[in-house]
Amino acid sequence: ALWKDVLKKIGTVALHAGKAALGAVADTISE
């Protein structure tokens, strides 16, 4: 189904955004 592809794409984007945010927070804390 098309909506499954959309959800998968949103999930992937959210995952990458979350990792990027965590990385930024970790960098900020370690400095």
From Swiss-Prot:
- Tissues expressing this chain: Expressed by the skin glands.
Q: Where does this chain mainly localize? A: secreted
Q: Is Acyltransferase among this UniProt entry's keywords?
A: no
Q: Which InterPro entries match?
A: Dermaseptin_dom (IPR022731)
Where, if anywhere, are coiled coils annotated? none
What disulfide bonds does the UniProt entry report for this chain?
Answer: none
Cited Pfam families: DD_K
Which positions does the record annotate as the modified residue Glutamic acid 1-amide?
Answer: E31
GO terms (BP aspect): defense response
May I have one GO cellular component term?
extracellular region
**Where located?**
Secreted
Arranged from A to Z, the UniProt key words for this protein are: Amidation, Amphibian defense peptide, Antimicrobial, Secreted
Per the entry, what this protein does is: Has antimicrobial activity.
Name the family the entry cites: Belongs to the frog skin active peptide (FSAP) family. Dermaseptin subfamily.
Protein name as it appears in the record: Dermaseptin-7.2TR
Source organism per UniProt: Phyllomedusa trinitatis (Trinidad leaf frog)
